[in-house]
């Protein structure tokens, strides 16, 4: 009986030993497989990062080569409300991008100036007189011009300006240059454009800069009542909303926030060189060059008041 019991104990021990060994082998195999899966996942993530970097580098290379005839493709990862969001997402190359303001029904192309601290949405550009700015209400409402070349002239459109500037507080910066290779700028806090019902009226806040404050008429109290553009409705030759007995848009050949008529008109007729005019229908910024000098180039651009510039 004792021998039988002893045999059973030995047999049981052998079986248990084999089972324990099998379990240990199974656990080791599981650990090995988990390590392999983790290694594969890590490699996949590394490859995804490399692919993203290569795509971004390719975009930069295309721009550096001057291939500007297309909007920069960001891969459809997300929609951006303005150029500041694109900049903050890591895209630091100036060029045309697609944006979609919060209330906009669709995306549209715009030039993003990623210099000068970055994140600027360009709403207007004058550079060579290649575009006709003597347009009707519909053209100014919807926008027009060259949305392909980086120095192309365009107006982003009053509807788009309204959609952009009602989604937050924006700063307007105006870069000006004359034919003598001098440059100045004017900057306004809280730039806002009203809706269609209010004829896309202009609202601007505190001024700073080197070109003088031509938009509010503060340069001379006696002319402010007729020269200020503050709260003025937009006018075109076929939609006269100014305070003048005549039609400022017809006389000055452009659409603008005219009063009686202006101390600034950045959409005026492009004169290809310095001139002495009988009328003030050129690209005018009175506080820098007066009413009778037409500027060589203008860029109007906006970004949020609270944007933190890139100081590089």
Swiss-Prot record:
Residues 74-306 form the Fibrinogen C-terminal domain. It is found in: Secreted. PROSITE patterns: FIBRINOGEN_C_1 (PS00514), FIBRINOGEN_C_2 (PS51406). InterPro entries: FIB_ANG-like (IPR037579), Fibrinogen-like_C (IPR036056), Fibrinogen_a/b/g_C_1 (IPR014716), Fibrinogen_a/b/g_C_dom (IPR002181), Fibrinogen_CS (IPR020837). Gene3D superfamilies: Gamma Fibrinogen, chain A, domain 1. The keyword Disulfide bond applies. Keywords: Adaptive immunity, Coiled coil, Disulfide bond, Immunity, Secreted, Signal. Its main location: secreted. Disulfide bonds join 83-112, 248-261. Pfam families: Fibrinogen_C. It comes from the Eukaryota. GO terms for biological process: adaptive immune response; blood coagulation; hepatocyte proliferation; negative regulation of T cell activation; regulation of immune response. Residues 1-22 form the signal peptide. Residues 39-60 form a coiled coil. SUPFAM superfamilies: Fibrinogen C-terminal domain-like. GO terms for cellular component: collagen-containing extracellular matrix; extracellular region; extracellular space. CDD domains: FReD. The keyword Coiled coil applies. Homodimer. Interacts (via the Fibrinogen C-terminal domain) with LAG3 (via Ig-like domains 1 and 2). PANTHER family: FIBRINOGEN ALPHA CHAIN, FIBRINOGEN LIKE 1A. Immune suppressive molecule that inhibits antigen-specific T-cell activation by acting as a major ligand of LAG3. Responsible for LAG3 T-cell inhibitory function. Binds LAG3 independently from MHC class II (MHC-II). Secreted by, and promotes growth of, hepatocytes. This is Fibrinogen-like protein 1. It comes from Bos taurus.
């Amino acid at each position: 009986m004792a021998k039988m019991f002893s045999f059973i104990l030995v047999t049981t021990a052998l079986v248990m030993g084999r089972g324990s060994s099998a379990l240990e082998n199974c656990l080791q195999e599981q650990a090995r497989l988990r390590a392999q899966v983790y290694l594969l996942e890590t490699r996949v993530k590394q490859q995804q990062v490399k692919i993203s970097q290569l795509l971004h580098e390719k975009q930069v290379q295309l721009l550096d080569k001057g291939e500007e005839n297309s909007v920069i493709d960001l891969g459809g990862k997300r929609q951006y409300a303005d150029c500041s969001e694109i900049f903050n997402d890591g895209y630091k190359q100036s060029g045309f991008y697609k944006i979609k303001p919060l209330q906009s029904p669709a995306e549209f192309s715009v030039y993003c100036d990623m210099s000068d601290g970055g994140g600027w949405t360009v709403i207007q550009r004058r550079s060579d007189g290649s575009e006709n700015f003597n347009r009707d209400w519909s053209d100014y409402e919807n926008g027009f011009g060259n949305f392909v070349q980086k120095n192309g002239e365009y107006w982003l459109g009053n509807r788009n300006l309204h959609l952009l500037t009602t989604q937050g507080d924006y700063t307007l910066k105006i870069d000006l240059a004359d034919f003598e290779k001098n440059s100045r700028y004017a900057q306004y806090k809280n730039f806002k454009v009203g809706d269609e019902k209010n004829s896309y009226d202009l609202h601007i806040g505190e001024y700073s800069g080197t070109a003088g404050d031509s938009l509010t008429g503060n340069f001379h109290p006696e002319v402010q009542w007729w020269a200020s553009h503050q709260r003025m409705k937009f006018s075109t030759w076929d939609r006269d909303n100014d305070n003048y007995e005549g039609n400022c848009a017809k006389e000055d050949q452009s659409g603008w926030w005219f009063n009686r008529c202006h101390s600034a008109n950045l959409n005026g007729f492009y004169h290809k060189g310095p001139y002495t005019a009988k009328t003030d229908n050129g690209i005018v910024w009175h506080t820098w060059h007066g009413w009778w000098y037409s500027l060589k180039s203008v860029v109007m651009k906006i970004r949020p008041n609270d944007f933190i510039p890139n100081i590089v």
